[in-house]
Amino acid sequence: MYKRQTPGCGSVSEVGFAQEAGCDLCKIFPGDVLGAKLVKGLLAPMPWSKLMVTGGVEPTQENLTSWIKAGVFCVGMGSKLFPKDKVAAEDWTYVTEKCKEALGYIAEARK
């Protein structure tokens, strides 16, 4: 079971400190600034780490594949997956289809 704390980390040291404090899942933020190469760099000396990237993650095949191939455990998405206009219009069909599409890209990338 994962602990509730998920600190934002941007370096090997920060991930290490978070793990020493008992965190099982560390959030890499902002993902779009730090990039997938950072994840590979973090996992090289700490392959046991479970990393979740957030911030600028897009529900596109290219973006999700790059994060999964880099080695993230999971991704977090907000406004890119749940656009304000679609939520305001209660267009749950759009949101549902976008979620299914994103999950499909993730499943394919994990093969």
Task: Give the location of each predicted region.
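Mobile acidic interaction elements
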Residues: 40, 45-48, 60, 64, ...
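Short, small-residue-biased leader/transition segments that mark boundaries at the very start
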Residues: 1-2
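Glycine/Thr-rich beta-alpha phosphate-binding loop at enzyme active sites
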Residues: 11, 17-38, 86
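Glycine-rich phosphate-binding active-site loops on the catalytic face of alpha/beta enzymes
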Residues: 28-35, 71-91
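Hydrophobic faces of well-ordered beta-strands that scaffold small-molecule active sites
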Residues: 5-8, 26-28, 50-55, 75-77
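Alpha-helical structural signal in soluble globular domains
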Residues: 21, 41, 45-46, 70, ...
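Catalytic cores of alpha/beta
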Residues: 13-21, 38, 58-75
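C-terminal helical cap(s) of enzyme catalytic domains, especially alpha/beta-barrels
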Residues: 68, 84-111
